[in-house]
C-alpha cells in the first residue's frame, strides 16, 4: 500500500476488539513514527504503553479528576492505550508550540502505521489530560504535558467500509496574496 493510499483509507475506530499488538510490534512502529520532522532533533516526546491493570489505574485517576468515586470505564474500551506526551526541551531555536507539534506528529504517524498494520486506532483526549492526578498517574515530569491517548485494538469484522466525504482541497489550499 502506498503512503497516499494508507492516509486516504485511514479512519478512527471508536470500537475495537480485545486483541492488540505486542510490545515488540508496537516498538517497531514507534521506531518508524519517530522519523517525523523534528527541528534540531530534540525528540520532545515520549509514549507510555498502558495495558491490563494500567488502564484501571488511569480509570481511577480520570474518575478522581472528574470529582467522581470509583473508576471510569473509558480506558477499558481498548486493550492497549498509548499515552502521547510532549516532553519540552530547553531550546532557543525551537519554541514549545513546535515541540508539541512534533509530539502530535509522532502520534498521528503512529496511528497511521497501526492502521496500516491492521489495528483499529482512535486518538482520544479530554479535559483531564491537563489534570494533576492524571499527570501523576502517568509519572509525568514538570516539563511534560499529556496530549491524549491512542486507543488500539483489533478491527471488528465487517466494519471496514467507512466512507468520508472527499475533501475539497480548494477550501483549504490557497496561494499567498500578491504584493500590491
Identify what each model region corresponds to.
Residues 69, 85-93, 176-179:
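Helix-biased detector of long, well-ordered alpha-helical tracts
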Residues 5-12, 17, 146-180:
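C-terminal helix-cap and adjacent tail motif
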